[in-house]
Amino acid sequence: YETIEVSTIPFSSVLKDINPKKNYLIKIDVEGWEYKIISSTKILETLKNVDLILEFNINNPFNNKLFNLLINFGYDSYLMTNKGLIKEFKPLTIPKPKIKSSRTIWRNHFFTKKSEYLVNKINKEKIGYVI
């Protein structure tokens, strides 16, 4: 194995450069630390124009807390599948059948404040149908 040092910056530093008049899509995949990062920043309180893609690990005890936090800030949740987006009312991360691991079939979840009509319209244009 080789160790490579990389520089990092706090998530809050990225957020300060966001223009409130533009729309953004932010993908966060920090191996189970999504709740800690999102709840420790002002992203949900200050930005109305940010959609999020978050990975939910099946064994993460913070999944429900993160899901509920985003719902309470006015986001709708959609499970991202090969067939398109499925609206969620609770986290629908599904374990792979007959495999002993933390891997899942679907782990990415799309959170948005856009209307369900607009999400379905975009889904239909990109995928061809709505689930």
Question: What would you call each of these model-derived segments?
Answer:
Residues S13-I131:
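Conserved acidic-Pro-Pro-aromatic motif
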